[in-house]
Amino acid sequence: MSVDISNFPNLALADTPVELRSLPFERLPVLCNELREYLLRSVSRSSGHLASGLGTVELTVALHYVYNTPFDRLVWDVGHQAYPHKILTGRRDRMQSIRQKDGLHPFPWRGESEYDVLSVGHSSTSIGAALGMAVAAESEGLGRKVVAVIGDGAITAGMAFEALNHAGDVHKDMLVVLNDNEMSISENVGALNNHLARIMSGKLYTTIREGGKKVLAGLPPVKELAKRAEEHLKGMVVPGTLFEEFGFNYIGPIDGHDINALVETLRNMRNLKGPQLLHVKTKKGKGYEPAEKDPIGYHGVPKFNPDECTLPKASGGKPSFSAIFGQWLCDMAAKDERLVGITPAMREGSGLVKFSQQYPDRYFDVAIAEQHAVTFAAGLAIADQKPVVAIYSSFLQRAYDQLIHDVALQELPVLFAIDRAGLVGADGPTHQGAFDISFLRTVPNMVIMTPSDENECRQMLYTGYQCNGPAAVRYPRGSGTGIQVESEMQALALGKGRIVRQGKGTAILAFGTLLQQAKAAAEALDATLVDMRFVKPMDEALVFSLAATHDQFVTLEDNAIMGGAGSAVNELLMRSKQCKPVLNLGLPDRFVEQGTQEEIYALLGLDGTGIQRSIEQWLQA
């Protein structure tokens, strides 16, 4: 059931930015209130990212009101905060479909709207992309403006600073809006800051400043005195020295919920020359008290009743793989004081909350810095510590060079606990863990394990921890099978699989949790079902023995078929001249769309029914 737009009379008049810009300025505060309430009612019915969007309502309205989007280009970082942007750009009536199969994409997406100029999902890309657009805008000479909106978390990543450094060097006209909702840069927000921002972004101030530079250019002592006076004035209330050193003109911080101040400041800044940075202070979850008090809990929400002011409690069902990892980490830390846990800004998602509380001195959240996380782990390993890097599959992609150069090349004992491997579901193609087996399998000295259930996951984590070189355990998002998890930890035989069901004719080699979906197919086809456990080193002896007693193979994995575990089986069989027909089942050669995990596995033929159907059709062909 969709939200009744008749309850939002001002928002009903602003289905697009063109309509928004036709509204009188005086109506914007009421429009913002309606937009915030509409967002709350919509997301609570669909599930999705809530707290970030509640905090960017006024900023979104102001940007589209001042800038001529889509001609002027507005680039959002990550995209969690872009729900108000979607509502104001012709997608309001489809918001209930967000993150659902065939629905709106969870993040800004180029194929969805002309207002989404950059497809996003991973952090810290906005400034670099916006700079490229700014260079192109200068070349085309049409007066196009470019704005990047980035959060205080995303701006900490190395590539954001690389882009800031480059932008300050080439000095193109662009605006970076720093959406600061964590008070991590400055707490100075209020009337004085808003007033100063208006002054410093205004024409009179900038004219005097630039003119003064020219007049005083021949008088170094006087020029230096004037510069210091300006810095002293700004330094009393402005934490912008860092950005000024990058070559940006820094304005702010200003109240990101004061629509009047935002519009006036953006109007003043719109035609300023060179790189500009506007520091905006916002409150995550603004306008909905439960989200203001618990912005982490309300970052991503299931369907809920906002009038009850509480989220539904998770059912006490099967533990998630993340929880299994978190418990193993605590148990292992109790046994080995050298263990160090590392995560790039994914404490809650990776199951590290308990560990961070029990072992705060051995827990490191390095922020959105995947490359640093891996090299930091390498340094710890060199110093005889035992680092465990908890990281999402899709985010490990950013640290590939560090994994090769700083860890694997030096055969350092770093354990990678790779969460969200396989299909994650509603977050869509930017977050599907589709490639980790493929890119890890090519790395020498790497051990890669694929647990079929949560008990195997625990034992594999222990196995990887005992390795003398780099090891990876990949496991999916969501709950396990409900199997009894053994408290005792035992190292598995390295590179050895196990036969789950003995059959004949066809041997199904399963890598990971899809083993559970293959059981019914194996029964129906009287096929042998194997839990391979290790992608690398692979159980070659087991594969060879199966090749001698079976007519064909089926490989099964929740990774891209190209370069994946099935490809490793193909290579092994061809190299040994024991060529057998092989059907590789896994993720296709495309970016996999959003939907529930169950929907997408069924769509790709990787649920129980689909696996059996694919094998039967292949055997009959």
UniProtKB/Swiss-Prot annotation:
Residues binding Mg(2+), per UniProt: 152, 181
SUPFAM superfamilies cross-referenced by the UniProt entry: Thiamin diphosphate-binding fold (THDP-binding), TK C-terminal domain-like
Pathway given in the UniProt record: Metabolic intermediate biosynthesis; 1-deoxy-D-xylulose 5-phosphate biosynthesis; 1-deoxy-D-xylulose 5-phosphate from D-glyceraldehyde 3-phosphate and pyruvate: step 1/1
Domain of life: Bacteria
Obligatory cofactor(s): Mg(2+); thiamine diphosphate
Textual note on the cofactor: Binds 1 Mg(2+) ion per subunit.
EC number: 2.2.1.7
Gene Ontology terms: biological process: 1-deoxy-D-xylulose 5-phosphate biosynthetic process; isopentenyl diphosphate biosynthetic process, methylerythritol 4-phosphate pathway; terpenoid biosynthetic process; thiamine biosynthetic process
Binding sites annotated in the UniProt record for thiamine diphosphate: 80, 121-123, 153-154, 181, 288, 370
Catalytic activity: D-glyceraldehyde 3-phosphate + pyruvate + H(+) = 1-deoxy-D-xylulose 5-phosphate + CO2
GO terms assigned for molecular function: 1-deoxy-D-xylulose-5-phosphate synthase activity; magnesium ion binding; thiamine pyrophosphate binding
Keyword Metal-binding: yes
Keywords for this protein: Isoprene biosynthesis, Magnesium, Metal-binding, Thiamine biosynthesis, Thiamine pyrophosphate, Transferase
Pfam families cross-referenced by the UniProt entry: DXP_synthase_N, Transket_pyr, Transketolase_C
GO CC annotations, alphabetized: cytosol
Function summary: Catalyzes the acyloin condensation reaction between C atoms 2 and 3 of pyruvate and glyceraldehyde 3-phosphate to yield 1-deoxy-D-xylulose-5-phosphate (DXP).
Oligomeric form and interacting partners: Homodimer.
PANTHER family, A to Z: 1-D-DEOXYXYLULOSE 5-PHOSPHATE SYNTHASE-RELATED, 1-DEOXY-D-XYLULOSE-5-PHOSPHATE SYNTHASE, CHLOROPLASTIC
Family: Belongs to the transketolase family. DXPS subfamily.
Listed name of the protein: 1-deoxy-D-xylulose-5-phosphate synthase
Chain's gene name: dxs
